[in-house]
């Protein structure tokens, strides 16, 4: 934990029962890696490449993924409270039952993301692209979605209590 692995090439690496808390993985290539169930709390993964990376059930609380590439990554059931995903590319990613309470997802690209039952309580999704995303049964209470793109998104049965849609784009969105 706390190691400096900036720009490391860990393509297809498999991590088992690892504690990577506070590890600096900025710019690292973790595409196709298996990080399922590992501890990455407070890790820094800014500008990292995590294409199709497995993060299922991982602890990502307070981790930073700013500008990271997480396309088609699997974050199902991950704990990512207070994590920073600002400007992250997360299109086609899997976030089923992921806990993103108070996470920052400003300007994140979540196009066609699978986010059923995700917890986004008090999350900041300002200017995020959620077009065609599936947010069925998601908890968005207190979330901020000002200027977010929700075109063709499915928010059926989502908890939208005190959700701030501001100037969100909602063409053909399902509520």
Label each PLM-derived region with a short phrase.
Residues 1-175:
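Tandem repeat scaffolds
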